[in-house]
Each structure stands twice: as structure tokens, then as C-alpha cells.
């Protein structure tokens, strides 16, 4: 037993050793490529120092850890300082462990931090340089850290050309950051090709610099092609995320379901997209008021939703949220931005209206209507003056007769109960109503509260009044047989006093009786026939005969009722044939139908029985009757009946035996249509129709109009033609022609004048040059043709208007004609001119223009021009020697 104990302990130790070895080997992972990061000697906390390509080492890693607590590594390989770090001259390194829990594998990456120093290397052309065989003058990838801490100038990389193996090469660069803005950010050592940066760079301003590197010999020869040299600026998380709005305003309906979307907040980050620097997370920092959390925000989308249905506007109507957004996927070292979100809780119909009390009382006087009797207040916690607060009232019970109406006062939200139909105290002394109320808007869904219609009881007390008689029912009916004897008495209209429920003491009067057939007994209200009642006279037939009755009590209060008299029919009218005269066209028509009617009720009417009474043998031999239906019979003739008019007696009898005989005139005519024989069937004289009378009247009127026209024409021909009065009528005649006239020689005396030689031969002067007494005068003009006018007939001087009235002037159709105006003015102006041409002794005056007749061409007298009319001396010398009384006048006239 003692030996067994040591054996078990040795065996356990061996197993433990093997287990530890297995764990060590399982945890030992494959080492990936070492990464070297150039960093400054002093590192600030929470600053990125570089990025490691973790996917190249281990793509499926789901756990990333750092062996050095001073540094932390993110999922994208970014390496950050956890605290401020100062590097010594020695190199510092740490390991990044990458693990895959499912595959139970692990890899590690060694990160070496080197303190960067300025590189100063001088290389001569002859110096032997060890190179890789495949190195060529080609673009070299290069990058620099944003907001780098230096030291500056910061070495970026070395540029080498293949031509440097054979020549002494000098390097230079150009592009943005060198000779373009920002100037002098980069420079290159001319001999070595070392590229440096002189100051920090903001990636948000410049994310890449496209430089061009040149290699040339001492004599300016381009030893190689220009090299594109892009320098990419690595992003640093130096920009805080910013919300798009400083204050967001959202609304949410109260009692909303959990998960209801309230709104969306959004933030932006100026750092490089699709990196951890711009991977944002949203959260709620604070809610005011600090009630249980009612809202949540999606960390990635920023969608704010409700998490509870206890949003109650009547408790809290507005919430304020402080929203936070953080980059670096929400890790604690990410940068933060905040904003305020105001959420207003809008009203929903989640509060039912309630009555303040369960029962109400109201009073109303009987016979009153359209009066308000009660106001019912309502309590509702919803938002005032909205559909959720306004209510509708309903009378659920007690208003079967429609006496009441309830409405809502829009201002106070009270129920207004009114009486719209009079109440009768004797019938209903008290009315019980059940009133219900609900909101205009429907109740909100899914709310855990009772939404049944609230109810209240209203008791309406009717107050009694001493009112007049009542005519109830308003229309009463009575039956009377027609042809009842005058003076017959029948029960009439009955009214009653509601106070004693009988009609004692009431008086009755008749207000309206269409035919005057009835009188009313004032005391009893019975009706008495004053005329024979004929049902067939009343129009329309079979209608009730209505009489309006007035009932009056002792206080002269009254009511009005209608007594409807139903006149019962008796068989007092025999059937009657409608036709008086018929035409039968022989041989086209072999018969005619005879129709009969009976104004009595159908029970006293059809079927009718038609027959030919005992008549002459000729009628019985030539004519016969056969039944067609209950109201018609067919009258047929024999073939040997002659063409003439027959008078045939026909007897018609109804079902009760009432009969009547009528003489029917039948014209048996040779025709094709009955209208062809109607004119000859009349035994009386011809009667003119309305159109014939109208035609006669129009003919007479036309004859009178023709005679009147002839008479007016005769009187118009015998009446002398008058010359018009002076057409100018004391108005100015337009005469504004200022151009020279025609170049012609005309007589100065274009009017009817007396010649200077006092010739006794009369003439009508014209504008011509020749004259013929008593005949035609030829007028010769310089332009135009010849024009003939018939001169005034008769000798003597034509000085007056009447001298030419008896003449008849004929003017050729193709000649010029004078107007009436010219004919009227010519003799008058000629007479005026002739008188002015004479002195007191009626001799030609020397102070006037003398008239000379044209004597033909070649006259030794020559032509009389305008200058011949002017005297040799003006005779104005007397103005130079005025008398004293005229000197003052002359001086006044000569002043300007």
C-alpha cells in the first residue's frame, strides 16, 4: 500500500506535464510577418500610430488582443495608444494575437516600434551600391500619417533611378505640395533622392498628393522618364461626429404601440469613409422628465422608437432626449457628438367623455315647443377643441314620439336638451329619457380601458296649463248616402276639453264647405244636409268631401278639425252612350262599335246590356246589335241597306236594371274614310271655322291698305313740289379747298341776271357761253363735253323763286345734273347780284364789277381780265388829310 502511493503520484505528475505541453503546443500559433512602425519618441494617449494588415495574416480571426496594455488594436488593424508613451533609444515591440474560437487556432503578429531619426546619407556616383536585381524606376507606394507629430522634416522614402548606376543623377519633384498649394510641403534631396515632409497635413483638406519625380544628369539630360509619385495621407480620428441638426422635433401619438417609429436622427463624420473613424453608434444619454425609459434608438440607423404603450399626453405631453453619437463603432475612446431631441406627445381619443352626475331633472310647460329645458355638462381629459374632446349626444330611450331633441354646444361642449314637439300634460305628466354621449372621433385602438357609451337619466316634468279645446283626432270621418233628403241629421265632429275630458260647453262652427251641402248644429256638432248630396257632382269622384270645423269653448279658445264625409253611392244614374253621330263607310266598314259609361260605382255599373227596342220594321230588318264586351256593343247593317242617314234607338241597361234609350244618328255613306262624309251629315247651315274668319279679316285689311295707298298717291301728285328751305340752316358751309381751280374761262355771271343793255328777253343764266331763248341753252366748257339744260320757259325776268316752279326740267342721263340746292340758290343769288349792280337810278353802277358776255373768238374787244376791274387811282389820298375828330381814331387804329 505504501508503494502504491508514490507510483500514483509519479503517474499524475507525468500526465500533468503532458497536459501542459499539449496546452502550450495548442496555444502556440504560427507567427506572421513582422510589422515595423516608425513613430516619434513621445506618443500621446488615444492616438493612432499605424495600421497592421490583419487579414493578410489571419482572415477568420474573431478575437484580437495586444500583449502590451499600452497599445490596443481594433478589428480593422488600427493600432492606438491607450496612454501616453515615451520611447527610449531602444526599440520597443509587442505582439498581436489573432484567435479563431471555432477552429481553435491562433496566430500572432509582431509589431516593432522604431524611433524615427533623420536620414542623412551621401552617395557618390562611383560608390558601389548593392541592389536587388529586379529594382526598376517605377512608382513607389508611399503614405504619411495625418497630423503627424514629426520630428520634421519627416522622412517618407528614398527615390532611386536605374540610371544612377551609370551616371551622376540629380533628383527633383513637382506637383501639389511642392510648387502648387500647399507650397513647400515636400522636398527631395538633390543628390540622395530622400523625400521629406516639412509639416503636418490634414487629410480632410488633402487626402493624396500626386507628385512627379525627375532624374537628370549634371548637364540637364533626363536620365530617366518622370516618375508619378502618389503620397497618400493616412486618416487619423481627429473629427468629432456631428448631428445634422442641433435640435430635432418629433411627434408621437399617445398610447402608441411599442416599436412605433418616432423619428430618425443622423450624424456625419469628416474622417475617411468606411473606416472605424466613421463607423458611428447612436445612443440616448438622458431623458427628461426622468420617468421610466419610454424611447430607444437603433445604434446603427438612428431610428427612435417607443418601448412602452404608457405614453399619456394628459400626464406628460413633451419629452426631451439628449442624443449621443460616437465614432470608432461606439468604443469608449471614440469621439462623441450630442444633440437634443424634443418629442411631443399628440392627443388621441383615449379618454371617454363622462357625465358629472348620473341623473338630471328638467321642467317644461305643456304645449311649449322649440324651447331649451336642460344643459348637460361633460368632462373629457382629451385636448380641448379637437374631435377627441367634442362630443355627440344621443337620446337612447323615451323619445319614441319625437318630442325632444338634444344637440351639442360647440363652445362649452354641453348637451342642450330641447322640446321640439308640444307635450300634453293630460297624456304625459312625466317623461323619462336616457341620454348617451360619445366623442366625434373614434376611440384609440388597443387601449386597455372601457370605451362603452356613457349614459345618464333625465326626468322631464310637464307642467299643467289651462288650455283650450282639443280637436283630436284632427280628421274625423262620417258616411252619408247620396240623394239623402234635405234636413237629414247625422253625427258630426266631436272635440273635447282636456281638463274634464268631455265636450260639454263647446260650440261648433263651419269654416269651409266646398259645395254648401252641410250645416252644423252649434251645440251638438251634428251635421244637417242643406242640399241633395250628389256623389257624381264632386270632383274628383270617389274622393272624400272635406268640411273644416271650428270648436270653441266658453273662453273663446278654439281648435280646428276636419270632417271627412264619405258619400255612399246609390244607383241613380243609367248607362249613357258616348256617341251622338257615327259614319259607316260602305262597303269598307261592316259595323261600328257603340260605347257606354255609367258614373255610378262599379257595383252599379257594368256589365251593360244593349238592345234595339221596338222600332220600325225597317230598322229591325237592316240593323242588328251584338255584344263586344261589358261596356260595348257592335252595330251592324245588312247588305241591302241603302246609303242614307238613319236614326236608330238603342237601349242600355246596367246590372241593377237602370236603363236609358238614346237615338243614335248613323250615316251609311259610300266612302273610304268616315271624314269624307262628315260635312254632308250636318242638317244645319255651314258654320265658319276660326281660320276662315281670320282669312276674311286679313283680306278686308289688305283691301283697305291698297285703297289708302292709291288715295295718298293721288293727293301727292296734285300738290306742288316745294323747294327746300335754306339747307345751310344758319350753319357754316365747309369750303376749305385751297388749291387753284380748273384752267377754264367761265362767265362771271353764273346766275340768272339781267344784261347791262337791259334786254327784255328773259333767260336762265348758266355757266356756258351761248344762249337760246325759250329753248335749250348750250354750255361750252374748256374741259369736259357739252351739257344741255332746258331753260325756263316764257319771257320776262326770272327773279323770284316761283318763276321756275311751273317748268319741267329734263336732264340727259349721261350729262351732269344740278342738285335741288343749286336750283334753289342760283336764281336768288342772281337777283341779289343784279340789284347790287345798279345805282339809285337803276342804272349799271361803276363801283361794281360789270358783266360782259362772251362774244366769240377774235373779238376786237379782247378779254376782260382781273386787272381791268381796278381803277387807275386808289382814291385814298383823303386819308392823309383827316379832320381832327378822325385823327384820334386813326391813331388808335394804327397802334400795335
UniProtKB/Swiss-Prot annotation:
Cleaved propeptide residues: 28-135
Tissues expressing the protein: Expressed throughout the basal and spinous layer of the epidermis with weak expression in the granular layer (at protein level). Also expressed in the buccal mucosa, esophagus and cervix (at protein level).
Q: Where does the record say carbohydrate is attached?
A: 166, 392, 546, 629
Gene3D superfamilies xref list: Cadherins, TCF3-CBD (Catenin binding domain)
Places the protein is found = Cell membrane; Cell junction, Desmosome; Cytoplasm
Q: Which GO terms describe its biological process?
A: cell adhesion; cell-cell adhesion; epithelial cell-cell adhesion; homophilic cell adhesion via plasma membrane adhesion molecules; in utero embryonic development; protein stabilization
Q: Give all residue intervals belonging to the Cadherin domain.
A: 136-243, 244-355, 356-471, 472-579, 580-690
Lineage: superkingdom: Eukaryota
What Pfam families does the database record attribute to this sequence? CADH_Y-type_LIR, Cadherin, Cadherin_pro
User: Which InterPro entries does this one have?
Assistant: Cadherin-domain_protein, Cadherin-like_dom, Cadherin-like_sf, Cadherin_CS, Cadherin_pro_dom, Cadherin_Y-type_LIR, Catenin-bd_sf, Desmosomal_cadherin
Which cysteines pair up through disulfides? They are none
Q: Does the keyword Transmembrane apply?
A: yes
Subunit info here reads:
May form homodimers. Interacts with DSG1; there is evidence to suggest that the interaction promotes cell-cell adhesion of keratinocytes.
In its UniProt record, what illness is this protein linked to?
Answer: Hypotrichosis and recurrent skin vesicles: A disorder characterized by hypotrichosis and the appearance of recurrent skin vesicle formation. Affected individuals show sparse and fragile hair on scalp, as well as absent eyebrows and eyelashes. Vesicles filled with thin, watery fluid are observed on the scalp and skin of most of the body. Mucosal vesicles are absent.
Q: What is this protein called?
A: Desmocollin-3
Q: Which organism is it from?
A: Homo sapiens (Human)
Origin organism lineage: Eukaryota, Metazoa, Chordata, Craniata, Vertebrata
Name of encoding gene = DSC3
Amino acid at each position: 500500500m505504501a508503494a502504491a502511493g508514490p507510483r500514483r503520484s509519479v503517474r499524475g505528475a507525468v500526465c500533468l506535464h503532458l497536459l501542459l505541453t499539449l496546452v502550450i503546443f495548442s496555444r502556440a500559433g504560427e507567427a506572421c510577418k513582422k510589422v515595423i512602425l516608425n513613430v516619434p519618441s513621445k506618443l500621446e494617449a488615444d492616438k493612432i500610430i499605424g495600421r497592421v494588415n490583419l487579414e493578410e495574416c489571419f482572415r477568420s480571426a474573431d478575437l484580437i488582443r495586444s500583449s502590451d496594455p499600452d497599445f490596443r488594436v481594433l478589428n480593422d488593424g488600427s493600432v492606438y495608444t491607450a496612454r501616453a508613451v515615451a520611447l527610449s533609444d531602444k526599440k520597443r515591440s509587442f505582439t498581436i494575437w489573432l484567435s479563431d474560437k471555432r477552429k481553435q487556432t491562433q496566430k500572432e503578429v509582431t509589431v516593432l516600434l522604431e524611433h524615427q531619426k533623420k536620414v542623412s546619407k551621401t552617395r557618390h556616383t562611383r560608390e558601389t551600391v548593392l541592389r536587388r536585381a529586379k529594382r526598376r524606376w517605377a512608382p513607389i507606394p508611399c503614405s504619411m500619417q495625418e497630423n503627424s507629430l514629426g520630428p520634421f522634416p519627416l522622412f517618407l522614402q528614398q527615390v532611386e533611378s536605374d540610371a544612377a548606376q551609370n551616371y551622376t543623377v540629380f533628383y527633383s519633384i513637382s506637383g501639389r505640395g511642392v510648387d502648387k498649394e500647399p507650397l513647400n510641403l515636400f522636398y527631395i534631396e538633390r543628390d540622395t533622392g530622400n523625400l521629406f515632409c516639412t509639416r503636418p497635413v490634414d487629410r480632410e483638406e488633402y487626402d493624396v498628393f500626386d507628385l512627379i519625380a525627375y532624374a537628370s544628369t549634371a548637364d540637364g539630360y533626363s536620365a530617366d522618364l518622370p516618375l508619378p509619385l502618389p503620397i497618400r495621407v493616412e486618416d487619423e480620428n481627429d473629427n468629432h461626429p456631428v448631428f445634422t441638426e442641433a435640435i430635432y422635433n418629433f411627434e408621437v401619438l399617445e398610447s402608441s404601440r411599442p416599436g412605433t417609429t418616432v423619428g430618425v436622427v443622423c450624424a456625419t463624420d469628416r474622417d475617411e469613409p468606411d473606416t472605424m473613424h466613421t463607423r458611428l453608434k447612436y445612443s440616448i444619454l438622458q431623458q427628461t422628465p426622468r420617468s421610466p425609459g419610454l424611447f430607444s434608438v437603433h445604434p446603427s440607423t438612428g431610428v427612435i422608437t417607443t418601448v412602452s404603450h404608457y405614453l399619456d399626453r394628459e400626464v406628460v405631453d413633451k419629452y426631451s432626449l439628449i442624443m449621443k453619437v460616437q465614432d470608432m463603432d461606439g468604443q469608449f475612446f471614440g469621439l462623441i457628438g450630442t444633440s437634443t431631441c424634443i418629442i411631443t406627445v399628440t392627443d388621441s381619443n383615449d379618454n371617454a367623455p363622462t357625465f358629472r352626475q348620473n341623473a338630471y331633472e328638467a321642467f317644461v310647460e305643456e304645449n311649449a315647443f322649440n324651447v331649451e329645458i336642460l344643459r348637460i355638462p361633460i368632462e373629457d381629459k382629451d385636448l380641448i377643441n379637437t374631435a377627441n374632446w367634442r362630443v355627440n349626444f344621443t337620446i337612447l330611450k323615451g323619445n319614441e314620439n319625437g318630442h325632444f331633441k338634444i344637440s351639442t354646444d360647440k363652445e362649452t361642449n354641453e348637451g342642450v336638451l330641447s322640446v321640439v314637439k308640444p307635450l300634453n300634460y293630460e297624456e304625459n305628466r312625466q317623461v323619462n329619457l336616457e341620454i348617451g354621449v360619445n366623442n366625434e372621433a373614434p376611440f384609440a385602438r388597443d387601449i386597455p380601458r372601457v370605451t362603452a357609451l356613457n349614459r345618464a337619466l333625465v326626468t322631464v316634468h310637464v307642467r299643467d296649463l289651462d288650455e283650450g279645446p282639443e280637436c283630436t283626432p284632427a280628421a274625423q270621418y262620417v258616411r252619408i248616402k247620396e240623394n239623402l233628403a234635405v234636413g237629414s241629421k247625422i253625427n258630426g265632429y266631436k272635440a273635447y276639453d282636456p281638463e274634464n275630458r268631455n265636450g260639454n260647453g263647446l260650440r261648433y262652427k263651419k269654416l269651409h264647405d266646398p259645395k254648401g251641402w252641410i250645416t252644423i248644429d252649434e251645440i251638438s256638432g251634428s251635421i244637417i244636409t242643406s242640399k241633395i248630396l250628389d256623389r257624381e257632382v264632386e270632383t274628383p269622384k270617389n274622393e272624400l268631401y272635406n268640411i273644416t270645423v271650428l270648436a270653441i269653448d266658453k273662453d273663446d279658445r278654439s281648435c280646428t278639425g276636419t270632417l271627412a264625409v264619405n258619400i255612399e253611392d246609390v244607383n241613380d244614374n243609367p248607362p249613357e252612350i258616348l256617341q251622338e253621330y257615327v259614319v259607316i263607310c260602305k262597303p269598307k266598314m261592316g259595323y261600328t262599335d257603340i260605347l257606354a259609361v255609367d258614373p255610378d260605382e262599379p257595383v252599379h255599373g257594368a256589365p251593360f246590356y244593349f238592345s234595339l227596342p221596338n222600332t220600325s220594321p225597317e230598322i229591325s230588318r237592316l240593323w242588328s246589335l251584338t255584344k263586344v264586351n261589358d261596356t260595348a256593343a257592335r252595330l251592324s247593317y245588312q247588305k241591302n241597306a241603302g246609303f242614307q242617314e238613319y236614326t236608330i234607338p238603342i237601349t242600355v241597361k246596367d246590372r241593377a236594371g237602370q236603363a236609358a234609350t238614346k237615338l243614335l244618328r248613323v250615316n251609311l255613306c259610300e266612302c273610304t274614310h268616315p271624314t269624307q262624309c262628315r260635312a254632308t251629315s250636318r242638317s244645319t247651315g255651314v258654320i265658319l271655322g276660326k281660320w276662315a274668319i281670320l282669312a276674311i279679316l286679313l283680306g278686308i285689311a289688305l283691301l283697305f291698305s291698297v285703297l289708302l295707298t292709291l288715295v295718298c298717291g293721288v293727293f301727292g301728285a296734285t300738290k306742288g313740289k316745294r323747294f327746300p328751305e335754306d339747307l345751310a340752316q344758319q350753319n357754316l358751309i365747309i369750303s376749305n379747298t385751297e388749291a387753284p381751280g380748273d384752267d377754264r374761262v367761265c362767265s362771271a355771271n353764273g346766275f340768272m341776271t339781267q344784261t347791262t343793255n337791259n334786254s327784255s328777253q328773259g333767260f336762265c343764266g348758266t355757266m356756258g357761253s351761248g344762249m337760246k331763248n325759250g329753248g335749250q341753252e348750250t354750255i361750252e366748257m374748256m374741259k369736259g363735253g357739252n351739257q344741255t339744260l332746258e331753260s325756263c320757259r316764257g319771257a320776262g325776268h326770272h327773279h323770284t323763286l316761283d318763276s321756275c316752279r311751273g317748268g319741267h326740267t329734263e336732264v340727259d342721263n349721261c350729262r351732269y345734273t344740278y342738285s335741288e340746292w343749286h336750283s334753289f340758290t342760283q336764281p336768288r343769288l342772281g337777283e341779289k347780284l343784279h340789284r347790287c349792280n345798279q345805282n339809285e337810278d337803276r342804272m349799271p353802277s361803276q363801283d361794281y364789277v360789270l358783266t360782259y358776255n362772251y362774244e366769240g373768238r377774235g373779238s376786237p374787244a379782247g378779254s376782260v381780265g382781273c386787272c381791268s376791274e381796278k381803277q387807275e387811282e386808289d382814291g385814298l389820298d383823303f386819308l392823309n388829310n383827316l379832320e381832327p375828330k378822325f385823327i384820334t381814331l386813326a391813331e388808335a387804329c394804327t397802334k400795335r
